[in-house]
């Protein structure tokens, strides 16, 4: 099952929507998640996908906190589960391989232009509480996916702290399921996106977003768009199909200097992942 997430920065030009359709076709996407798609343009995108796929694609639920919309192949049994979260929503996907439902959480967290890192750190426990409450209702905290724009790098405090996303870079650690801190048990997420950091990492780029400032501290490449997995899904992640997409049908999404080609496109790059479920 192929998933793709892209923060499209409210770009709904005809040319760009055609590129999204081409990307869906080229990468054989089953579940397409688009962030910052204006509500008034959802139907346009849905109709374009239906036309391209001969009515084999449809929209799932509404906008997640007015930020993210999901489209999926008719072959995928996916439905909204809880859309009451702030900046996050939950969906259920039926897995024939696992013979159970998998939870898909889609997130678009607060950005750093309007929210400080300290403020993000204060808000992230609310996301964690929402996830754990939904998992409790589902009766399963081992088969969850979180995907989206976290507006944070994998190494930031909110992403790694026990009271936050508790997302680790090492699959063997994540497979332990939980760890105890000061007498309280915390459940792990596995974050495979760590593997893209640096020139020696996976793929062609070190992040999904590029920003150059005149500040003394600047990373330039930021890995804001990520996927996290609970331990029950680790063996089903196809590492070879985890990618930051940099081309669509031969057209480069990067400039000659290696930064993101934002004109007519988006300031984020899309991410693709595959779960053999």
Give a label for each model feature.
Residues 137-139, 152-277:
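Metal-dependent phosphoester-hydrolase catalytic domains
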Residues 9, 38, 110, 150-153:
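Catalytic metal-binding/acid-base residues of hydrolase active sites
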Residues 30, 142-144, 149, 225:
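Conserved acidic residues
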Residues 33-112:
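Structured beta-strand-rich core segments of catalytic domains in phosphoester-bond hydrolases
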Residues 1-51, 55-60, 67-69, 262-277:
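N-terminal, active-site-proximal structural segment of metallo-dependent hydrolase catalytic domains
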Residues 6, 35, 107, 147-149:
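Active-site flanking residues adjacent to catalytic metal/cofactor-binding acidic residues
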Residues 109-124:
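Surface-exposed cleft-lining segments at the edges of enzyme active sites
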Residues 126-147:
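His/acidic metal-ligating clusters that form di-metal
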